[in-house]
Regions:
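Small/aliphatic-rich secondary-structure junction motif
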Residues: 3-53, 78
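Structural beta-alpha unit
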Residues: 73-112, 149
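A short acidic, glycine-rich active-site loop
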Residues: 52-66
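Intrinsically disordered or low-complexity boundary/linker segments at protein termini
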Residues: 1-17, 78, 106-110, 137-149
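Glycine-rich, Arg-bearing micro-motifs that act as flexible, cationic patches
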Residues: 111-133, 137
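Histidine-centered beta-alpha loop that forms part of the nucleotide-sugar donor binding/catalytic region
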Residues: 10, 89, 116-119, 147-148
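General small-molecule cofactor/ligand-binding pocket signal
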Residues: 36, 83-87, 143
Length: 149
């Protein structure tokens, strides 16, 4: 049975490095990659008052497309089997739920490969809040790709 690796991708330099590492590792291990970009839900009183559901969904898709520009080409060129998807919500919760849901599929996620820090400058020192949460979730092994020094 082939392995499946989940790669959270937020467009940060660390996420790009982790994706490149995951692509190389998937080629070596003949694994499948699931690249997941997670957009905010915008479920606030102000957002619901000012925007309708369709506007919010269109904006999330726009952010997804901007963030993942070039990702699909890199995945196609890798020769690895892959999927590129968008999730919506809190990244920690979406990642845990994605791993758990995959257990009921033909391609359960064996490993999360992610950068040590993402795009949020307010949380985390050496290790970002999402990376830290994934390690502590215990849903599956996590490989952290360190940021450039």
């Amino acid at each position: 049975m082939a392995h499946t690796y989940l790669v959270p991708y937020d467009g940060s330099d660390n996420a790009k490095k982790a994706l490149n590492w995951a692509i190389d590792y998937a080629k070596l291990t003949k694994a499948r990659l699931e690249v997941l970009n997670i957009q905010p839900s915008f479920k606030t009183v102000h957002a619901k008052t000012l925007f309708n559901k369709q506007d919010i969904e269109e904006y999330q898709c726009q952010l997804f497309n901007e963030c993942t520009t070039g990702v699909e080409d890199a995945l196609k060129n890798s020769g690895a089997e892959y999927s590129l998807q968008m999730g919506v919500g809190d990244p920690k919760e979406v990642l845990v739920e994605t791993v758990k849901a995959s257990r009921e599929t033909a391609n359960p996620i064996d490993l999360i490969i992610m950068g040590s820090r993402g795009t949020n400058p307010f949380f985390g020192g050496v290790l970002g809040s999402v990376s830290y949460a994934m390690i502590n979730s215990g849903v599956c092994p996590v490989m952290i790709i360190p940021q450039e020094k």
